[in-house]
Structure formats: structure tokens, C-alpha cells
Amino acid sequence: MLDAKKIATTVKDLVKPISDNLGFRLFDVEFKPENGWVLRIIIDKEGGVTIDDCEELSKRVSALLDVEDVITSSYFLEVSSPGLTRELKEKWHYEFFKGKYARLYLKEKIDNKQEYAGYIDSVEDDTLVLRLLDKTLKIPFDKIAKARLDVEKW
């Protein structure tokens, strides 16, 4: 059986130097079953990612993975930008998007709520500081179940 997390981590380590060399920030790598296996590589760069950027990285990664033979089953390779409502998984994602509006779903309630939306104020060690309308909330990263950038509600 395939170890999806291990494959994603290995691919991430292999792809990062190529991504960096092309001027991209490697945002995430996922390997998931979706009507067959999908290797999803998500990149970003200042000014945004173009289709040509995705195509260039896809060609290079495809050639590399053919040689490295990390994935033993058939799969689809998908290279894309993270999109407007990108998921925030790594600590650096929060630092990178400081000042942006985000929606967080917590593993357990804080102040009697399990979902918060506000501005990413800062990162302090292992804690996210989220600026809400009426207060600032400190949320330990290990309490966050899922987080993503969101579009402000008017």
C-alpha cells in the first residue's frame, strides 16, 4: 500500500530546489486518491503564477520523477497556484500572509466558539495572533484543525 504522506514529503524535498531555482515558492505538495492517485504541487510567486509557470515546473518535475521513481503506481501530476482561499498549513504560511483575512476552524472551543474569522496579526512562537473586530485572540497552532485565507464579508 502507498504511504501518501511519505511520498508527498519525499516529492516536496525533491521539487523544492527546482521550484526555488525557477523563482517559485513551494506552497504545498499533496498525494491523494481522487479517482486514481493525484500528485498536486502548489506553487506561488510574487505577482502570481501563470499557466506557463505551472507548465514549466510540471515538465521538470515529471522528468525528475521518471528518474527518481518515487511513486510506483500510476498518478496524475497537477501543478497549480494556491488560489484566493488557499489553505494555511505551515507556520510560514501565516507569517507570509500577515495582514490577510483568514477563517479558522479549531479542534476545540476557545471563548465558547470553534470557528473564527479575522486578520492574521502576527505569529508568536507556536501561537497565531488573530485580530477580530472587537479584540485580538491568541490561538495555539496545535488547536487549529483547519485554516484558509478567506474573502472578507461586507
Curated annotation (Swiss-Prot):
Transmembrane segments: none annotated. GO terms for cellular component: cytosol. InterPro entries: Ribosome_maturation_RimP (IPR003728), RimP_C (IPR028998), RimP_C_sf (IPR036847), RimP_N (IPR028989), RimP_N_sf (IPR035956). Gene3D superfamilies: Ribosome maturation factor RimP, C-terminal domain, RimP-like superfamily, N-terminal. GO terms for biological process: ribosomal small subunit assembly; translation. It is found in: Cytoplasm. The keyword Cytoplasm applies. Belongs to the RimP family. Required for maturation of 30S ribosomal subunits. Keywords: Cytoplasm, Ribosome biogenesis. It holds the Pfam family RimP_N. PANTHER family: RIBOSOME MATURATION FACTOR RIMP. It comes from the Bacteria. The lineage of its organism: Bacteria, Pseudomonadati, Aquificota, Aquificia, Aquificales. Its main location: cytoplasm. This is Ribosome maturation factor RimP. The gene is rimP. Signal peptide: none annotated.
